[in-house]
């Protein structure tokens, strides 16, 4: 029964080329037969059989349909195209904006009424030329590109040249083709459940399980 429930083949990854570098059986899943009774052996067989069924189902879900397990060149349509990292550039300072927003912020921070309030009536009058929070906002030409502006007043501007950044998202003009990345490799090369590995002739054994198999020449190095 142990031959009917094979140990799966674990794929190795070659990061330089983006291809599989052979596969070998994971013998760490084998049990210690010297301390196992018939009942334990039966339970282990059941667990191994369930594991193989899970791996087969996972492969059907995550693998990209293809005729060759590891093609020499993966076309762009079969590859996960990773987004390019964003590029950050420094924006020039806008001294006019800083002065205008600082002046407005000084009024928002507080102030004294120009005229005494009428007796018994509290009038929420704001003095100065500051903006009202419930009314208009500063002109779009006064707002910094990075969205930073000052609400609290002061004699010194709180803006710093290091705060003015613009982030640009780059995009590749040509889709990538060739080998798979590490993220896609885990999805495409699920541990292989090779049923009855010793029941057929040697030439039926998958060549891509062999580490020194050359996918370009479709041959095994050192063998005719």
From Swiss-Prot:
- On whether Phosphoprotein is a keyword of this UniProt record, the answer is yes
- The answer to whether the entry has keyword Phosphoprotein is yes
Which residue positions hold the site described Cleavage?
A: 111-112, 154-155
Induced by what?
Answer: Expressed in the late phase of the viral replicative cycle.
Domain of life where this protein originates: Viruses
| GO MF terms held by the record | hexon binding
List keywords of the entry alphabetically. Answer: Capsid protein, Host nucleus, Late protein, Phosphoprotein, Virion
Proregion residues are 112-154
InterPro entries given for it? Answer: Adeno_PVIII
Question: What Gene Ontology cellular-component terms does the record carry?
Answer: host cell nucleus; viral capsid
Q: How does it get modified after it is made? A: Cleaved by the viral protease during virion maturation. May cause the middle segment to be shed from the capsid.
Any idea which residues bear Phosphothreonine here?
Answer: 64
Q: What else is known?
A: All late proteins expressed from the major late promoter are produced by alternative splicing and alternative polyadenylation of the same gene giving rise to non-overlapping ORFs. A leader sequence is present in the N-terminus of all these mRNAs and is recognized by the viral shutoff protein to provide expression although conventional translation via ribosome scanning from the cap has been shut off in the host cell.
Q: Which family does it belong to?
A: Belongs to the adenoviridae hexon-linking protein family.
Can you state the subunit structure given in the record? Interacts with the peripentonal hexons as well as the hexons in the facets. Part of a complex composed of the core-capsid bridging protein, the endosome lysis protein VI and the hexon-linking protein VIII; these interactions bridge the virus core to the capsid.
HAMAP family annotated for this entry? ADV_CAP8
Output this protein's name.
Answer: Pre-hexon-linking protein VIII
Q: Which organism is it from?
A: Canine adenovirus serotype 2 (strain Toronto A 26-61)
């Amino acid at each position: 029964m142990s031959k009917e429930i094979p140990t799966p083949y674990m794929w190795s990854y070659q990061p330089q080329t983006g291809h599989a570098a052979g596969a070998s059986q994971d013998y760490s899943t084998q049990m210690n037969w010297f301390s196992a009774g018939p009942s334990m052996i039966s339970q282990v067989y059941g667990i191994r059989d369930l594991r193989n069924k899970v791996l087969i189902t996972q492969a059907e879900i995550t693998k990209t349909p293809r005729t060759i397990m590891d093609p020499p060149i993966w076309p762009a349509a079969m590859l996960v195209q990773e987004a390019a990292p964003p590029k950050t550039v420094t924006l020039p300072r806008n001294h006019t904006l800083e002065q205008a927003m600082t002046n407005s912020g000084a009024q928002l921070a507080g102030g004294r009424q120009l005229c005494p309030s009428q007796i018994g009536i509290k009038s929420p009058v704001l003095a100065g030329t500051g903006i009202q929070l419930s009314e208009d906002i500063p002109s779009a030409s006064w707002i910094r590109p990075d969205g930073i502006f000052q609400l609290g007043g002061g004699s010194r501007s709180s803006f710093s040249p290091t705060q003015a950044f613009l982030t640009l998202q780059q995009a590749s003009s040509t889709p990538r083709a060739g080998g798979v990345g590490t993220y896609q490799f885990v999805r495409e090369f699920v541990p292989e459940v090779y049923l009855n590995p010793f029941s057929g002739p040697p030439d039926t054994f998958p060549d891509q399980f062999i580490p020194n198999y050359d996918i370009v020449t479709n041959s095994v190095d050192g063998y005719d």
